[in-house]
């Protein structure tokens, strides 16, 4: 069945942790996909890992609250082995503010619930998904649990944007997850003609045996007009994979090694990388000539 509904969240994790996903959802995924190794890069209160461990699955949970940053740190390096299933459940749209509210006393700059706008969120979540893909075995599955949001007359479909920003050749399934016990002000929806959103999506991709950079470069060519942030994420993904900093020549080499022929034969691709590095000081910093790193 592609529609999942579990009113009871189960015994796993913390019921007080707002936005926590029902453990029955994870159990359903594990029963279907039978992963030997499961990774959750945004584990929150630990529901997913508790379910996996109970089912005898080798599980790894990472999170901002334990010092792991899915935007800046390599999931593959942190875990030390690839996963059969790598699934995240990010905070989105500011509906549930994570850092400084659910966890910790102060806001975290890479907390996805604190993005300044949807554009920033879309770019950052794409980078997280690419990070998840890199940590997934060939033939394994990676994905995210995410919903939509309507506010101030604007409907944002986060799952549609995720699908548009990831390789269509790897999209494996979109499951609908019913939402229960949502916190909302009923008066806010009294005069609405359109229904209140009571569902999320579980979007799954199956990794094929090609590099993330090949897929990204294809996306850059196919959707250049729409995805202006793709080149930034190509360079960011390279720097994450190289440990957060690298010589310009090493960045070139990584692109040349992984990119398709139509990219490496383009006379301007090195110029595009330099342009991306130089025009985005909030993302990239140079400590010396030819040496680049992720901005603090």
Feature names for model-found ranges:
Residues 1-276, 286-289, 294-296:
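Class I S-adenosyl-L-methionine-dependent methyltransferase catalytic core
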């Amino acid at each position: 069945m592609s529609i999942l509904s579990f009113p009871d969240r189960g015994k796993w994790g913390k019921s007080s942790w707002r936005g926590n996903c029902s453990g029955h959802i994870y159990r359903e995924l594990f029963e279907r996909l039978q992963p030997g190794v499961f990774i959750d890069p945004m584990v929150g209160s630990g529901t997913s890992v508790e379910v996996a461990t109970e089912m005898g699955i080798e599980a790894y949970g990472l999170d901002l609250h334990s010092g792991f940053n899915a935007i800046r740190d390599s999931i593959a390096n942190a875990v030390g082995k690839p996963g059969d299933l790598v699934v995240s459940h990010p905070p989105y749209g500011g509906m549930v503010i994570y850092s400084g509210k659910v966890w910790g006393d102060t806001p975290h700059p890479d907390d996805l619930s604190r993005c300044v706008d949807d554009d920033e969120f879309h770019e950052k979540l794409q980078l997280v998904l690419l990070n998840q893909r890199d940590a997934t075995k060939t033939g394994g599955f990676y994905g995210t649990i995410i919903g939509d949001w309507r506010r101030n007359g604007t409907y944002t479909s986060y799952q549609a944007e995720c699908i548009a920003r990831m390789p269509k050749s790897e999209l494996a399934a979109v499951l609908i997850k019913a939402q229960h016990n949502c916190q909302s002000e009923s008066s806010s929806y009294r005069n609405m003609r359109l229904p209140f959103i009571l569902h999320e999506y579980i979007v799954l991709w199956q990794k094929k045996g090609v590099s993330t950079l090949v897929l990204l470069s294809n996306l850059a060519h196919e959707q250049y007009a729409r995805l202006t942030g793709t080149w930034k994420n190509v360079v960011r993904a390279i720097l994450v994979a190289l440990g957060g900093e690298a010589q310009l020549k090493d960045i070139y080499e990584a692109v040349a090694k992984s990119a398709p022929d139509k990219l490496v034969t383009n006379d301007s691709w090195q110029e595009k990388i330099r342009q991306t590095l130089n025009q985005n000081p909030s993302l990239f910093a140079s400590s010396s000539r030819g040496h680049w790193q992720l901005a603090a």
